UniProtKB/Swiss-Prot annotation:
Keyword Cytoplasm tagged: yes
Listed HAMAP family: Cytidyl_kinase_type1 (MF_00238)
Originating organism: Flavobacterium psychrophilum (strain ATCC 49511 / DSM 21280 / CIP 103535 / JIP02/86)
Binding locations of ATP: G10, F11, S12, S13, T14, G15, K16, S17, T18
EC number: 2.7.4.25
Molecular function as annotated in GO: ATP binding; CMP kinase activity; dCMP kinase activity
Family: Belongs to the cytidylate kinase family. Type 1 subfamily.
Catalytic activity: CMP + ATP = CDP + ADP; dCMP + ATP = dCDP + ADP
Primary site of residence: cytoplasm
Cellular component per GO, a single term: cytosol
Localization per Swiss-Prot or TrEMBL: Cytoplasm
Name of the protein this chain belongs to: Cytidylate kinase
InterPro entries per the UniProt record, alphabetical: Cytidylate_kin, Cytidylate_kinase_dom, P-loop_NTPase
Top EC class of this enzyme: transferase
């Protein structure tokens, strides 16, 4: 079967990465969680105190972008690739609510997006890739053979995220997670550079009431019909 590019976009906590992993594993494709890359840069900014509740030193972050090395390394025990920031595994650190609170602000910086889009396009130049994010079908791979746009209610997404974080023993309330989801929705859809929008040729899937297996079957059928 001819290898294709699959772009999965959508709002935060819609299960984009879960679906992308399922598809990549089934098809033998490369899986790239583009959000992990933005989270890693956000974590870097937090660690270097470029961003907090009171300030955001964008100039310093932009100046230091060349010093940031991002790569995915496959973990055979987990069955997927983990994010490495300057040769350190930060997969767990980038999934915290603290990083979630700032990632949309970091992702709105044009220089950050330019750096990561270039790296993402290099990853997918030979096709056979499933990548999820906010601008994959509109900016990174505008000619992708299959584009999916995932959505669900903010409350449903917040509950999923809360359950996930609670299972990882992170001390966070549902209301805090819901507020974060709603704030990220606003920033993601209103930023000047590559706002979150559905590509004209993307297929929208509202998975508010779909199981993981149901949505996987829907998308796999789409892949098989290309």
């Amino acid at each position: 079967m001819k290898k294709i590019t699959i772009a999965i976009d959508g709002f935060s906590s819609t299960g984009k990465s879960t679906l992308a992993k399922q598809l990549a594993n089934h098809l033998g494709y490369i899986f790239v969680d583009s959000g992990a890359m933005y989270r890693a840069i956000t974590y870097y900014a937090l660690q270097n105190e470029y961003i907090n509740q009171d300030l955001f030193n964008k100039e310093k972050l932009i100046k230091n972008l060349p010093q940031i090395k991002l790569e995915f390394q496959f973990n055979p025990k987990l069955g997927f690739a983990e994010m490495y920031l300057n040769d350190a595994n930060v997969e767990k650190e980038i999934r915290t609510i603290k990083v979630s609170n700032y990632v949309s602000q970091v992702a709105a910086i044009s220089q950050v997006r330019a750096k990561l889009v270039e790296q993402q396009q290099q990853m997918g130049k030979n096709k056979g890739i499933v990548m999820d994010g906010r601008d994959i079908g509109t900016v990174v791979f505008p000619t992708a053979e299959l584009k999916i746009f995932m959505t669900a209610s903010a409350q449903t997404r917040a509950q999923r995220r809360y359950d996930e974080m609670s299972s990882n023993s992170e001390n966070v309330s549902y209301d805090e997670v819901l507020k974060n989801v709603q704030e990220r929705d606003f920033i993601d859809t209103h930023r000047e550079d590559s706002p979150l929008v559905k590509a004209n040729d993307a297929i929208e899937i509202d998975n508010s009431h779909l199981s993981r297996e149901e949505q996987f079957k829907i998308v796999l059928d789409l892949v098989n019909n290309i």
